[in-house]
A protein has these predicted regions:
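A conserved helix-loop-strand patch within extracytoplasmic ligand-binding domains
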Residues: 1-53
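Solvent-exposed loop/turn segments at secondary-structure junctions
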Residues: 21-22, 37-39, 83-85, 100-104, ...
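Short amphipathic alpha-helical coupling segments at ligand-binding clamshell hinges
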Residues: 27-29, 138-149
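A local structural motif
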Residues: 27-29, 52-79
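Short helices/loops that flank or line small-molecule/ion binding pockets
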Residues: 45-46, 66-101
Length: 171
């Protein structure tokens, strides 16, 4: 049985510009989101966390567009296979992308994302990359030393310098 010895980093979802380059233009916008359950929920939570929509209480990481209870900006959602979202950016106002698809499209969180998941978001806490060890070994000195090293300021700086926000050190 494996357990979490420590969270190290996560890859944030981001909202990227399409035909619009500013969130000042979000009224009546069309936003492309991934259509698979996990990624669609992350996209919707990103928008909720930033005050653009409200989801039903408790849906969390199972949210779909059917769970939107308030949409004050009259946003239209286009649900697509995640790999298709970057290709549709010229045709939609904005798109919410997984980090890997953003990088493949030449986009970076640091330079291009208008919004991205914070390290205290539900998604970051759920999808953080961890050091997994056999249960009972999580408190061994060598495991603690490994986790401490991977969470050190030096490693955090390396991540920040090399991944343009596509990978973010976890708190």
């Amino acid at each position: 049985h494996l357990v979490n010895a420590g969270g190290i980093h996560y890859e944030p979802f981001g909202l990227y510009p399409g035909t619009e380059t500013s969130l000042d233009n979000i009224d009546n916008a069309t936003i492309a989101v991934p259509n698979d359950t996990t990624n669609e929920a992350r996209a919707l939570l990103l928008l909720q966390d930033n005050g653009y929509i409200t989801l039903k209480d408790g849906v969390g990481l199972t949210a779909t567009t059917k769970d939107i209870v308030e949409n004050p900006h009259n946003i239209t959602f286009v649900e697509l296979e995640a790999a298709q979202v970057p290709r549709t950016l010229p045709e939609v106002s904005f798109g919410v992308l997984n980090g890997n698809y953003a990088m493949e499209a030449g986009l970076t969180v640091a330079d291009d994302a208008l919004l991205y998941e914070s390290d205290d978001s539900e998604a970051a806490a759920t999808y953080v990359n961890v050091i997994a060890v056999k249960e009972g070994n999580e408190n061994l000195p060598k495991i603690k030393a490994l986790v401490d090293t991977l969470k050190s300021d030096e490693i955090k700086q390396f991540i920040n310098d090399n991944y343009n926000g596509g990978v973010i050190p976890y708190k």
